[in-house]
Amino acid sequence: MGSEMCIRDSVYSTDYNVYHFDAYFNTVYSAVNGVARSGLNSGVYGYYALILAPILKLIGGGINTFIILMAALSAFSYMAAAYVIIELVSNNAVRIMAVTALIVVNCSLHTGVYFQLVPHRTLFAGIILAYLFFGVKRKYCYKPVYIIINVCLLMISVIWNFETGIVYTIAVAAYYIIDNVKKYNFKQAGLYTNTLIVVLALIGTIAGAWVITGIINVLMGGSFISIKQFIFPLMNSDYFDYLRYEYQKGIVAWLITAFFGLFFIGNVFFNSNLNTGDKNIDDSRYDAFMAVVAVMALGQMTYYINRTAYGNLTIVHFTTVIMIAVFADYCIKNYQKSKAG
């Protein structure tokens, strides 16, 4: 799959969207050559170049090397998402269909040189979900080392691309908030103190990513990056207005994503202390994890909402496939139980 993505994304394989490739690679090329970010050297895709530049310098900073690196990162993200599906879903037929859909759909649609969506805005979705699920399964989520690695991953995702990184950070924070909701009811102080800690950690993660980016830019000979510049283009309404289109009419894919997202969020709160007041509620955290997938999907979909070209809905492909697979697996399990009973 990595090879397939590499061939399809090769700047030599097609002349379609080469300007997009130039726009994406230019920032990396500048960083590799030590050019700091400034008003004349900026970009709307985030500070991914600061992460890619050291790797490219190590293995060779040419275009071909860059394409291979992006293909490898993309393949790793797909494998991470496949790991989540294989571990969450018990029915083998659903597993096979979900993993196949995960790979084939994106690869078949990816016919031009356009890194800005896949893998740029989907890369950390698979990686962060896989790491969180690993922690949930192994019960590592509150281990100090696990949390430190998690925060580092989230900071890197924010530096890579702010508009998706902040969604991933909020989604992971949502897991810990939901876990508190499962443990405590409204009358218990732990609900509020622990939630406050999570919110402060969320703010600290974003602030940490900003400070690290600013320091690196200063070390490269530039100025410290302002918070407005760091989160661009989210504070620039003209950028979004320029790229706004009409939504598709009728029953379309984004409604399916929205339905499953709201379903899994509703499910986790229905099975919480806020609803039942039951202190002996099941300690399983898989429904909380699925709520994280849902939050991530709905948050990522804001990219599509602001740029409603149909192909941009690919940004929620990972999360939507996971939600549909888990829902289908749940339905099959219940059908088999009712049939056996």
Predicted feature residues:
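Transmembrane and membrane-interface helices of multi-pass
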Residues: 96-108, 293-298, 323, 327
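Membrane-interface alpha helices of multi-pass inner-membrane proteins
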Residues: 146-162, 168-173, 198, 296-303
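Specific aromatic-rich, kink-prone transmembrane helix
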Residues: 120-140, 152-153, 173-179, 319-323
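Transmembrane-helix signature of polytopic, membrane-embedded enzymes
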Residues: 81-109, 141-146, 227-229
